[in-house]
């Protein structure tokens, strides 16, 4: 795992000395995030931040928030986007979501909310386009692993998926 974290930090995003790094991930990945953050620092990062995303909360947001709230962008979120557009941190997206995590939610409501948010966030995303380093890396989560290896226990499925990723 250490080698994988090093590969992401040094080749995936190619950290520049003093650069800020943001790791977008699920809370299930705390152990790997710790390894990855350390490898980013060893590669020269000036600051490493974890941006936690929790799919069960997203599911509840879709279910209970009004379309206006769900499609809105808070002032602090917009300020963070502005900061990112100005400072161009390296972004690491750790993909480990439950493939079925949003099943049964109102997909039309979710799509409309994402479109509304995009109208607000687009100028910041456009400002970053082709100007910052980013990397998407797979990190097995239990539900994803169980989807791939349903006959195995959660832990065994996760270990097996790690084996395939690290080949």
Language model segments and positions:
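Active-site bordering "gate/hinge" segments
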Residues: 1-167
């Amino acid at each position: 795992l250490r080698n994988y974290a090093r590969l992401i930090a040094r080749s995936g995003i190619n950290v520049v000395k003093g650069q800020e790094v943001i790791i977008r991930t699920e809370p299930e990945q705390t152990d790997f995030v710790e390894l990855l953050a350390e490898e980013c620092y060893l590669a020269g990062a000036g600051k490493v931040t974890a941006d936690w995303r929790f799919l069960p909360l997203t599911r509840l947001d879709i279910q209970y928030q009004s379309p206006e709230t769900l499609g809105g962008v808070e002032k602090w979120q917009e300020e963070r986007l502005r900061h990112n557009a100005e400072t161009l941190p390296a972004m690491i997206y750790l993909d480990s979501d439950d493939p079925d995590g949003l099943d049964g939610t109102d997909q039309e409501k979710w799509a409309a909310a994402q479109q509304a948010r995009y109208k607000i966030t687009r100028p910041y995303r456009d400002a970053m386009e082709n100007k910052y380093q980013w990397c998407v890396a797979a990190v097995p989560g239990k539900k994803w692993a169980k989807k791939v290896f349903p006959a195995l226990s959660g832990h065994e499925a996760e270990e097996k998926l790690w084996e395939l990723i690290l080949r």
